[in-house]
Regions:
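Membrane-water interface at the C-terminal end of transmembrane alpha helices
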Residues: 130-147
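Core segments of alpha-helical transmembrane spans in multipass integral membrane proteins
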Residues: 30-37, 56-77, 93-103
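Membrane-interface interhelical loops and short amphipathic "cap" helices
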Residues: 9-13, 41-54, 81-83, 112-117
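Membrane-helix boundary connector in multi-pass membrane proteins
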Residues: 103-121
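Cytosolic juxtamembrane helix and N-cap/initiation of the first transmembrane helix
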Residues: 1-29
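Membrane-helix boundary/interface segments in integral membrane proteins
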Residues: 47, 69-86
């Protein structure tokens, strides 16, 4: 008796056929850019604390959505749904590095006032934005390979 089972290709974790990771990725990108802009505005304003608070909120939301996206990316990667090419690995590493840098950045931003942004806070924000933009840029070729 022939018991062949039809093989259905696995799909990324999705809602209504829309991959969740692709929906979540823009949130940390926008939030980390917003945090950087708030840091620069804080320094230009002479230390208006509203900009420091706004930067911290951007970092918090960016990290929350980023960690969720990172977990989904890892699951898709383990399930072999994200290409394990040089681009796929680079995307994963740049994205995780950006989250790690921004995690350190949020701890720096919890300091008091000027010292939270001037120096290491702004530097970490710049590094985090560069890393997340590279990760987002590398994502497009990785998605096209899957389709």
């Amino acid at each position: 008796m022939d018991e062949t089972v039809a093989h259905r290709p696995a799909r990324p974790i999705s809602i209504a056929r829309h991959p969740i990771y692709s929906m979540l990725l823009p949130v940390p990108v926008v939030c980390f850019i917003g945090a950087l802009l708030a840091d620069v505005t804080y320094l230009k304003s002479g230390g208006n604390l509203i900009w420091l608070a706004l930067s911290s909120w951007f970092l918090l939301f960016g990290l929350a959505f980023g960690v969720l996206a990172a977990l989904i990316l890892l699951i898709d990667f383990v399930r072999d749904l994200t290409p394990r090419t040089g681009t796929g690995w680079a995307h994963l590493l740049f994205f995780y590095a950006a989250l790690l840098v921004e995690l350190f950045s949020i701890f720096i931003h919890e300091r008091d006032g000027w010292t939270a942004v001037a120096g290491p806070g702004l530097t970490l924000s710049i590094i985090g934005v560069v890393l997340i933009l590279i990760a987002a840029w590398l994502r497009r070729p990785a998605v096209e390979v899957v389709r």
